[in-house]
Curated annotation (Swiss-Prot):
Gene: RMD9
Name of this protein: RNA-binding protein RMD9, mitochondrial
Keywords noted in UniProt: Membrane, Mitochondrion, Mitochondrion inner membrane, Phosphoprotein, Sporulation, Transit peptide
Transit peptide: 1-58
Lineage summary: Eukaryota, Fungi, Dikarya, Ascomycota, Saccharomycotina
Main subcellular location: mitochondrion
Highest taxon, organism lineage: Eukaryota
Region (Disordered): 15-39
Gene3D superfamilies (alphabetical): Tetratricopeptide repeat domain (1.25.40.10)
């Protein structure tokens, strides 16, 4: 496998890993020795019949299309803004707006375009005629980076998700609508004169972020048959098409290999993105020879330019694929061990949690003992802590994947299962809130004693319960044989945490946790229905606003019996319910009534009286 570059040396060192995992009768095929210099260069493709697609290329369409010569008045406001239009760092809406300083959400300067504004202007033919290749590429780049950064910010930052949910949803809708609009215009051919492979790569990449796989395949199949079909055969574009075609089974593996082989020439450099995706697909198909060929091809490019980020990223990605997707566990484990080492690789491998959880799952399926799997999990967790990985995202994903696989193997609390769970907890390099929350969320065992012991770990390990912790505990109590009073105590502890955190209202997530532990608790739902209705009757006015209350009641319409019961709280001054219990509201510092629930929700019950019959 690895051509390791010795520190301070000019020559590469070939270690023995390739010879260990690659059949001795095979030969390693590498690409050209020409230097890779650009991630947007275009690679020749001379076969005009690709799996039945007739590729048409005008001689004027090569690589980046030429800019149109248009005479425009100097006073044209859009042309003046286009002259200054550049790729800008994206800032999510919920970070732009600060209620304390009254900052505006959209603080784009007059010299730039917002995503929404540019998307709307694209509908205007006059505006489209003013665009050149750079303008369109910058817009596509801003779409792509905006989508990536917005999602990364939401996943990695500690924010009030109830508060930010609407703005985050609105931003996602803006970005998704914009890329779909751009995709539609590109498919009509109206932007062919300013279209380039690098722009298409950003468009396909954005569609991929939204998992719009059908749109990717449809755009590619349309584009490859157009007058600029050669642009759709650029290696960076094909890298995404191959991935999506494989995931959706639009292309089988033989067809993917045909696309790859027909797009590669022996004397031309293979784009690292294409080598990366082909290597990943090959690993998933169990074709390790092809995957290792792709890896060695990338190592050739690395030796020519050790600082090329696209090559380094592609090497790391194929490495991860061997760990997470290889069913040959001997190969997967060798790549895993190399990835955990801080030294010894010429590229940096970020041990991404989804690949690690897949590796753990494959090890269990492949017959590794649970003790061995627990040790792998322990070492990954330790690695994350040492590398200062974000605990909220990476560790949460890792723990969720591990415990999911663990409880799939041990769905019942046998002695062996309990001992192994204790071993996992004792082996964990750090028992923190993320680990305990994830463990309790995935626990299928309806054993009150075990559940309570896990809850005690918060105190034993000095872990402070957050609002999320209290919600998870309340929700998971649905399967535990608690009394109504014990469920009510968990509810009160949640409210106490909300009040301590400065919440003035009971959020939807809190009502959802209560509903799960009572009305939706399966075998306990009958005895806990009265508890739910009693709590709702007391705290109904503590909802966030009128909209939240209306949506709350509307969500019950799908359950006719429950809707009739809950509607009594709106329609009756003092409704009586079977199994009702006494609920006292303590003194709060922050939590308070915000609405008149009965008055607000009357519009829901009045909308269709037949539902109450």
């Amino acid at each position: 496998m690895f051509r390791l570059i010795a520190s301070g040396a000019q020559q590469g060192l070939r270690p023995s890993l390739i010879s260990k995992v690659k059949p001795p009768t095979t030969t390693t095929t590498t690409s050209t020795t020409s230097k890779f210099t650009s991630t947007t260069q275009h690679f020749p493709f001379e076969n005009n019949n690709l799996l039945g697609y007739q590729v048409r290329n005008n001689s004027s369409q090569a690589g980046v299309a030429s800019e149109p010569k248009i005479s425009l008045p100097e006073t044209d406001v859009y042309q003046q803004k286009l002259l200054k239009y550049n790729i800008k760092k994206h800032e999510p809406y919920h970070l732009k707006f600060n209620p304390k300083t009254k900052n505006q959400r959209n603080n784009d300067s007059a010299s730039s375009f917002s995503i929404d504004e540019f998307s709307q202007l694209l509908q205007d033919e006059t505006f489209r005629n003013q665009l050149n290749e750079k303008h369109l590429f910058v817009y596509a780049s801003n779409l792509y980076s905006g989508t990536i950064n917005s999602r990364r910010a939401r996943l990695n930052k500690s924010k009030n998700r109830d508060k930010d949910q609407r703005s985050a949803f609105r931003e996602d809708m803006t970005l998704q609508s914009a890329v779909l609009n751009l995709t539609e215009i590109i498919s009509t051919g109206e932007l062919n004169s300013v279209l380039s492979a690098r722009t298409l790569f950003k468009v396909f990449g954005t569609l991929l972020q939204f998992k719009l796989n059908d749109e990717i395949v449809n755009l590619w199949e349309t584009g490859v048959n157009s007058d600029v079909g050669k642009l759709y055969l650029a290696h960076e574009v094909l890298s995404i098409v191959i991935q999506v075609g494989h995931e959706t089974r639009r292309f089988n593996y033989d067809e993917i290999k045909q696309i790859y082989e027909m797009s590669v020439k022996e004397d031309k450099t293979v784009h690292p993105y294409l080598s990366d995706r082909m290597g990943q697909v090959a690993v998933m198909e169990g074709d390790y020879v092809t995957a290792l060929d792709a890896l060695e091809s990338l190592m050739n490019l690395y030796e020519q330019n050790p600082n090329e980020k696209s090559v380094l990223g592609a090497l790391a990605q194929i490495h991860l694929s061997f760990i997470g997707h290889s069913k040959d566990l001997a190969i997967a484990e060798r790549f895993f061990e190399k990835g955990l080492q801080k030294e010894g690789l010429p590229y940096s491998v970020i041990m991404k949690a989804p690949y690690m959880t897949s590796f753990l799952s494959n090890c269990i399926a492949g017959g590794y003992s649970m003790e061995e799997v627990i040790d792998f999990w322990r070492r990954i967790s330790k690695h994350y802590l040492e590398q200062d990985f974000d605990l909220i995202s990476s560790q949460s994903t890792l723990h969720a994947g591990f415990f999911k696989s663990f409880f799939e193997k041990y769905p019942e609390p046998s002695k062996e299962a309990i001992d192994l769970l204790n071993l996992a907890i004792e082996s964990a390099p750090k028992v923190n809130e993320v680990l305990l929350n994830t463990l309790i969320s995935n626990l299928p065992w309806a054993d009150k004693e075990i559940f309570n012991k896990l809850l005690n770990l918060y105190q034993e390990k000095n872990v402070t319960k957050s609002i999320v912790s209290h919600r998870i505990i309340l929700k998971q109590s649905k399967q535990i044989e608690y009394t109504n009073e014990e469920i009510l105590q968990l509810w009160n502890e949640l409210l106490g945490k909300l009040d301590e955190a400065g919440y003035t209202y009971i959020a939807n997530a809190d009502w959802s946790a209560l509903r799960a532990s009572t009305m939706f608790s399966g075998k306990f739902s009958y005895q806990r229905t009265g508890l739910y209705l009693s709590v709702l009757g007391k705290y109904k006015d503590y909802m966030q606003n009128n909209f939240a209350a209306i949506q709350f009641l509307r969500n019950w319409v799908r359950d006719a019996n429950a809707y009739r019961l809950i509607s009594k709280i709106t329609l009756e001054e003092n409704p009586q319910f079977d199994g009702a219990i006494k609920v006292d509201i303590p003194e709060f510092d922050s939590l308070r009534p915000n609405i008149n629930y009965r008055e607000v929700t009357k519009q829901v019950t009045d909308a269709d009286p037949r539902l109450l019959e």
